[in-house]
Amino acid sequence: MTAGATLPTAASAALFERARAVTPGGVNSPVRAFNAVGGTPRFIRSARGAWLTDADGNEYVDLICSWGPMLLGHAHPEVQAAVSAAVARGTSYGAPTEPEVELAEEIAARAPVERVRFVSSGTEATMSAIRLARGFTGRDVVVKFAGCYHGHVDSLLASAGSGLATFAVPGTPGVPESSTALTLVLPYNDRAAVEKAFAEHGDRIACLITEAAPGNMGVVPPDADGSGGGFNGFLAETCARHGALFVSDEVMTGFRASRQGQWGLDGAVEGWRPDLMTFGKVMGGGFPAAAFGGRADVMSRLAPEGPVYQAGTLSGNPIATTAGLATLRLATDDVYAHIGAAADTIKTAASDALSRAGVEHVVQAAGTMFSVFLTAGPVRDFADASRTDVAAYAAFFHAMLDQGVYLPPSAYEAWFLSSAHDDRAVQTVLDALPTAARAAAAAQT
């Protein structure tokens, strides 16, 4: 059944009830539960191209793309063929394979990294990068920004302390104070806060980690103005000046914001490089895969070459690396141009529809990924993002869902498209926007 104004949800609702009996909250990642928007989470049965089909047979244009990885759309035939051939050869060997070498070479050809180590999740990548930074520098303090998400690493699930440049407190039950006692949390895009933190703690700071363009509070681009380049360039220079490592988290933006990730939009232009980078999502082609990489002298500190320990049973497994390699080889400049054009069309139409409905909003982007904030802009940090009207977004979300468009079920996430989003898919989104904008207007708080 094609999605329409009133959608059946009985099958999804029944599956959700079964799931809640055996899984906390009925889901394996919290945002999937629809708690932020209400209603019945859709259980997806299949996906192809730009479209999802749920357990009730409803079809949706997918503007989540598995939270970023599906750059080429779902069930891309060439990726499927490569994966099928790899599966036929065996699924995991616990030994080195050629695909992991080829994928590392492909990543190093696009991103400014000299060595790459594979892991199985973005959380593992950031956790390992921080351990390596501490091992390399002999220091213990880590700096991060409020609103930037780096996976569920204990030391990074931190909330800002009771003053600027103070040490953090745990951001969730289950994280002891000792885990965040060496983490500084600063407001994003705030150069003065960064300078103050390094002035007070610079000789103890092992690294500063940031999302290259935050997407987990909605898309909040790094400030592009300022002498010597944008905010990321300023961070790179500040870290270098104080002997700390600059860790750029491109789990979301890597090979998604552009062919070279967010770095291709700022660092490649301004002439700076991170010391370490983390990757995930797109580089796994829809499979569990992530990586961290960087300067050869830093990466050489990893075991077995150096003393900093890191390992993983399924790290670099042949199925995930084959899928990632096939995806990156197919991700040409034309792919990014197509996605960018489709994203621009939707961004413009969303803004027009919301303006006509009288809904205060701002649309922000980092390359091909973007967010619609239902608040006055610009949104420069987590405090700004927190002002978005979540009730209005929930109404907007459900109006789009009822018309066959699957948006992130949270006001604080990025929207993603793929090369499979053709004219029909884009037009479906455009047709749904006016009704959704009016629903948002009616629900404004």
Curated annotation (Swiss-Prot):
Its cofactor is pyridoxal 5'-phosphate. Keywords: Cytoplasm, Isomerase, Porphyrin biosynthesis, Pyridoxal phosphate. CDD domains: OAT_like. Pathway: Porphyrin-containing compound metabolism; protoporphyrin-IX biosynthesis; 5-aminolevulinate from L-glutamyl-tRNA(Glu): step 2/2. GO terms for cellular component: cytoplasm. Pfam families: Aminotran_3 (PF00202). One of its GO terms (biological process) is protoporphyrinogen IX biosynthetic process. Signal peptide: none annotated. It is an enzyme of class 5 (isomerase). It comes from the Bacteria. One of its GO terms (molecular function) is pyridoxal phosphate binding. It catalyses: (S)-4-amino-5-oxopentanoate = 5-aminolevulinate. Its main location: cytoplasm. The modification N6-(pyridoxal phosphate)lysine is found at K281. Its EC number is 5.4.3.8. It is found in: Cytoplasm. Homodimer. Belongs to the class-III pyridoxal-phosphate-dependent aminotransferase family. HemL subfamily. This is Glutamate-1-semialdehyde 2,1-aminomutase. It comes from Nocardioides sp. (strain ATCC BAA-499 / JS614). The gene is hemL.
